[in-house]
Amino acid sequence: MKQIVADSAIEEVEDGMILGLGSGSTAALMIKSLAEKIRSGKLKNIKGVPTSFQSEVLALELNIPLIDLASVPYIDLAIDGADEVDPDFQLIKGGGACHVREKLVASKANKLLIVIDESKLVQNLNQVFPLPVEVMPSAWKQVKDIISEMSGVSNLRMATKKAGPVVTDQGNLILDVLFDAGIRDPKDLEMRINNIPGVLENGLFVDLADKVLVGKIEDDVPVLFSPSRRS
């Protein structure tokens, strides 16, 4: 299913594009499909801007030409995944702890295409998947306490392959936050959390996604569809 979604996303890519390369399992499949198109000559003069060290390493291994985010005035198209998508195309991202670079790339993109499976579609954000908040190591407890006053329950994300917490590409830590009633006003909450001293960025992507491509299984057959934005 993820491969079908990834392959379909590549159909949006045109020769000469500067392309934002997303992170995560579906994005990795997209990067591999992109590399094959470039290798076969079906796509030419593509330059990629990776959203994480993970996607950068994969792109380099597959010989996709890369360009630094700071050196481009805009990105033609960014293709990325999401952890949750609501009917207004507001997103939670950051399950891979790289939402800071993902948001930088998304905000510079002329178009942001989100590729997901049907399980990521939700009516209200944050009722299941926690909101990642990247914090300075010295500030995590202070930020946790402030978020608690906002009715949010925070847990420091712990690593699975090493002792201690997850450390981001920027050298920071991640608080995973669940709010009592979920997130009803993503725009307001994004601003309030980012205004907390010690917070670098949170995983709410508000008014950034232009199109969502969804894969699902229907009668044992993989099906693609693109929902309409509610608002």
From Swiss-Prot:
Keywords: Isomerase. It catalyses: aldehydo-D-ribose 5-phosphate = D-ribulose 5-phosphate. GO terms for molecular function: ribose-5-phosphate isomerase activity. GO terms for cellular component: cytosol. Substrate binds at S23, G24, S25, T26, D80, G81, A82, D83, K93, G94, G95, G96, K120. The keyword Isomerase applies. It is an enzyme of class 5 (isomerase). Pathway: Carbohydrate degradation; pentose phosphate pathway; D-ribose 5-phosphate from D-ribulose 5-phosphate (non-oxidative stage): step 1/1. It comes from the Bacteria. Pfam families: Rib_5-P_isom_A. Catalyzes the reversible conversion of ribose-5-phosphate to ribulose 5-phosphate. HAMAP family: Rib_5P_isom_A. Belongs to the ribose 5-phosphate isomerase family. This is Ribose-5-phosphate isomerase A. It comes from Prochlorococcus marinus subsp. pastoris (strain CCMP1986 / NIES-2087 / MED4). The gene is rpiA.
